[in-house]
Amino acid sequence: MLPRITHPIGRDSNCELADFFINIIYGLPATLFINHTIIESIAPDVIIGGKNRTSSRAFYGQTIHELSHASHFSQVGSAYWAKYISYIMTYGAYGDDNKGENAGICGVGEMWGYAIEDLLTNDKYGGLDIHKGADWIRADILHDLMKEGIVSPNDVFDCLTPLITTQNKLKEALQAKSPANHNIIETRFDTLNNN
């Protein structure tokens, strides 16, 4: 999705002075490189990392995971995704235990990515592989809600809007989407907050 990012990306921590200087050296050139080079016109929207994927199941799962991010991007757009990328640039792929600027955006994105990856991969290949992601992401919660039919993948996808910037906001959107299951959704997401 990098070719489609039109908003600035860069380091975004709690130290504004450090971020300023780092972004002059790192963030600004990265944004300009993405938006004003050949990357903009020929880079693929999705890159599937095949390294260390030694089975069809693993490659299929990785493909589903990355395509789930592409579907999420289609819902939220460039400004939201620039915050996601900036979080990863600042804190690493899964960050630091739901801390830092835009951690919630990463949590929602990875929760969706791993949950749909596991749901579809397990449906195709059988078995029960469930990724939590980092401990604070807890994709298993969303996976179980979908697997048990409490919410559908379409329900979750419909909730992935630019307003959903934390897992708690995702919970509230799912409760509004499925009011009959309000308490079940609340209970499942409570396990997220208690870990």
Predicted feature residues:
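Surface-exposed patches in mature extracellular/periplasmic domains of secreted proteins
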Residues: 1-7, 24, 79-84, 124-133, ...
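Solvent-exposed loop/turn segments at secondary-structure junctions
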Residues: 10, 29-30, 52-55, 69-70, ...
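Short pre-active-site segment immediately N-terminal to the catalytic Zn-binding motif
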Residues: 46-63, 104
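Active-site recognition of the HExxH zinc-binding catalytic motif
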Residues: 61-78, 110-114
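Post-HEXXH active-site segment of zinc metalloproteases
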Residues: 74-105
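Metalloprotease/metallohydrolase-associated module, dominated by Zn2+-dependent proteases
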Residues: 94-150
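Pan-zinc metallopeptidase signature
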Residues: 126-195
